[in-house]
Amino acid sequence: MAANTSSRAGVTLHNGAVMPWIALGTWEAPPGQVGRAVEAALASGYRHLDCAHIYGNEREVGEALRASRIPREELFITTKIWNSFRTDQQVRRCCAKSLSDLGVDYLDLLLIHFPVGGRRALKECWQTMEALVDEGKCKAIGISNNYEDDVADLLSYARVKPACNQIELHPRLPQDALVEYCKRQGMVVTAYSPFGRGARGGMLDHAVVAAIARKHGVAASSVLLGWSLARGVPALPKSVTPARIAQNNSDEVRGLALDADDVRALAGLEDGARFVAFFNHQSR
């Protein structure tokens, strides 16, 4: 399968669409705040939004999208099918609700949120998503929180190949083998929780990250996002603070060049720590 290509604008999926490097994550963005966060993001240049049915805030995201008057073709919108939707009827209902709430006619990327429910159910879910591609409801489909064996199983029957695997990634959990495996399959990997899970107990206050930030005269967040982009991995930082939202998609992030010493120091942080609760994979 052909490798994905990248440019300053973003990384190109196997369907030819360009996914911008930085997305605004909308997980745990509270009602009344997520809309303002989307407005701030779009005003500061974001064109990539990461959403999900289970987040329960897509209607407010959609209101902000409509208010922005940004042409649909300039946006890249991702959402996800939750674990309780696996049959053809359920998947279609979940997708239709996201389309309605977001106020769009199609999705750029539709993901299975977690690989749970059993092999037969996941296969039916995927085949319905393939039909949604055929019908123009989504441009690309993919997965989230999948290990190598999950990906291999999907590839054994997929007619439309997965474009993306969205996983937790940061220096403490780089998942190098999984990232490289997905890339060999022609998939883009995207990073959720690139800072850990917020500043408290996450990565933003880590001494190594702070030292690298001081060395380059940049924010700690820029170090973590720059590390992700240097791996060819788009990142999905979440914030509801306008200044931080703008910082996360700034030229400082895209222009940061980590040197070999920086990369080695960050590699030394790997300890397998996860900051996001992970659903157990059910038996196939």
Describe these PLM feature segments:
Residues 1-75, 196-198, 265:
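N-terminal binding-site loop/beta-alpha segment at the start of enzyme catalytic domains
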Residues 3-11, 59-65, 93-97, 148-151, ...:
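Alpha-helical scaffolding within the catalytic cores
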Residues 29-32, 51-60, 84-89, 117-120, ...:
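Acidic-and-aromatic substrate-binding clefts and catalytic sites of carbohydrate-active enzymes
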Residues 29-42, 87-102, 149-152:
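Short, acidic/polar
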Residues 46, 104-107, 138, 162:
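A structural motif
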Residues 72-86, 106-115, 169:
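A short, structured active-site edge motif that brings together acidic residues
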Residues 91-112, 131-135:
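CE4/NodB-like, metal-dependent polysaccharide N-deacetylase domain
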Residues 114-284:
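Beta/alpha (TIM)-barrel catalytic core signal, keyed to glycine-rich beta->alpha loops juxtaposed to Asp/Glu
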